[in-house]
């Protein structure tokens, strides 16, 4: 749930950062993130009647991996930087609780096990190439 502080910080970000150029926001607008949604059913099988904690959005998790690759961050450093940098939060599209580093690691491992990690990078790169970026 967004708070008044979230809106205030976002307003300041929009007024002071975006006019000077935010490469992550520009990158985010180039990608059709919905193209990644079909792999979700291959990764998660919510068959338990007991429920449990809901999965974090697959798009948010993929964006974590992209940030990690772009900035050369370890899993613990990624967690710290996402907590610290508002531009990362804007790129992720959330001010909600962020996954800890072990969740990012487990997500990447799950992608590897299902052969989806390569698909994600190919899709990401192909979309950027289609927009004229190499």
Predicted stretch roles:
Residues 19-22, 31, 35, 73, ...:
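Generic recognition of stable, solvent-exposed alpha-helical segments in well-folded globular domains
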Residues 60, 81-84:
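Non-catalytic DNA-binding core/recognition domains of DNA-processing enzymes
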Residues 24-66, 70:
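Basic, short loop/linker segments at the boundary and entry of helix-turn-helix/winged-helix-like folds
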Residues 22, 40, 64, 78, ...:
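Short, conserved catalytic/metal-binding motifs centered on acidic residues
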Residues 73-81, 88-101, 133:
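Short, flexible active-site-proximal loops enriched in glycine and acidic residues
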Residues 41, 45, 83-84, 109, ...:
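Short amphipathic alpha-helical surface patches that mediate protein-protein
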